[in-house]
From Swiss-Prot:
This is Photosystem I assembly protein Ycf4. Keywords: Membrane, Photosynthesis, Thylakoid, Transmembrane, Transmembrane helix. The keyword Cytoplasm does not apply. One of its GO terms (cellular component) is photosystem I. Belongs to the Ycf4 family. One of its GO terms (biological process) is photosynthesis. InterPro entries: PSI_Ycf4_assembly. Its main location: membrane. Seems to be required for the assembly of the photosystem I complex. The gene is ycf4.
Length: 193
């Protein structure tokens, strides 16, 4: 779940001037499993609905032709269509690797470049490194937990730079935040709720 760091190497000492952080996108095992389950379930519900409408068994399991079309077969058809559309959407996100990208801290140019793949186009944000005041770790526990690394910027909202998904382990989050703060020579702000 953690982002991979790599320091560029060239004849000059670029580890002091360039830091790249690769951010993983939507190509995760859990997304493949959910998209596959939705596809199978959606097709199954649609076939059960068609079986109840035409009175023939289109599924090898059960006996869906005995279902009354209104309301059981009709609702199964709606659920099947909805699940199939959501599955197609998830497969599209997986195909383009939505959310993947690169955080590139370049001291030579004095620019932080944050690039992410969107559904239809790539998003690129460039910020002067001098505008970065601190690296901030945000941790929120509870029903909807959030663990992420953000950059506190001068005159702007905080910019999240860690990957989206399940919460990262705290140790990994702290190590990544410390690596960035050390590279930028700024403060690492604590865990805020």
């Amino acid at each position: 779940m953690s982002a991979d760091f790599k320091e560029a190497s060239s004849p000059t000492d670029s580890s002091e001037t360039l830091l790249e952080q690769i951010v993983k996108g939507s190509r995760k095992t859990s997304n493949y499993i959910v998209a596959s389950m939705l596809a199978v379930g959606g097709i199954g519900f649609s076939l059960a609905s068609l079986s109840s409408y035409f009175g023939i068994d289109l599924l090898p399991l059960g006996n869906p032709s005995t279902l009354i079309f209104v309301p059981q077969g009709l609702f199964m058809g709606f659920y099947g269509i909805a699940a199939t559309f959501i599955s197609v959407y998830l497969w599209a996100l997986i195909k383009v690797d939505y959310g993947s990208g690169l955080n590139r801290f370049d001291k030579n140019k004095g620019v932080l470049s944050v690039s992410r793949k969107g559904l239809l186009k790539e998003i690129l944000v460039e910020i002067p490194i001098d505008d970065i005041q601190a690296v901030k770790l945000e941790v929120r526990e509870g029903f909807n937990p959030r663990r992420r690394i953000t950059l506190r910027l001068q005159g702007r909202r905080d910019l999240p730079i860690s990957e989206v998904g399940g919460p990262q382990p705290l140790l990994s989050l702290e190590q990544e935040g410390a690596e960035i703060a050390r590279f930028l020579k700024v403060n690492l702000e604590g865990l805020s709720n």
